[in-house]
């Protein structure tokens, strides 16, 4: 699936291809969500205060799904979810634990692979592959 996604430009994603990606994600029992349930018109990063308002909803999603692992993208989101200062560069391939309703979850901070994070996309891919190979 990864190679097929890499081989398509965003404008070439049609409904059929999107259905394929969603089906593959479902078959592999992956769940994808976003801490921020909104965005700004110009796609600027959201302030911490806005993202923190969505934490309860995210934790409810996690409590329902009960994932084996959680991957967070970028310093900002990783820090908010883990409630401590996180620098992805210092936490590559390391997990932190969070507890939600007496269930513990492994959280792996990973570089945000788009926007300004595009410069670290190779590291993000490397870390995600490592996490999959070692955790799934």
Where are these regions (language model features)?
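A polyanion-binding, active-site-adjacent surface
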Residues: 1-90, 104-119, 123, 130-131
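Short acidic-hydrophobic surface loop/beta-edge motif
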Residues: 91-101
């Amino acid at each position: 699936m990864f190679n097929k996604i890499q081989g398509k430009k965003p404008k070439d994603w049609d409904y059929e291809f999107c259905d394929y990606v969603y089906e593959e994600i479902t078959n592999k029992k992956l769940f994808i969500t976003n801490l921020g349930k909104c965005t700004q018109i110009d796609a600027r990063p959201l302030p911490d205060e806005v993202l923190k308002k969505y934490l309860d909803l995210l934790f409810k999603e996690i409590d329902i799904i009960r994932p084996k692992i959680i991957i967070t993208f970028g310093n900002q989101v990783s820090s908010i979810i883990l409630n401590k200062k996180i620098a992805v560069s210092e936490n590559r391939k390391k997990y932190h634990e969070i507890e939600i309703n007496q269930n513990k979850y492994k959280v792996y901070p990973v570089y945000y692979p788009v926007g300004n994070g595009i410069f670290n996309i190779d590291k993000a891919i490397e870390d995600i592959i490592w996490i999959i190979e070692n955790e799934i």
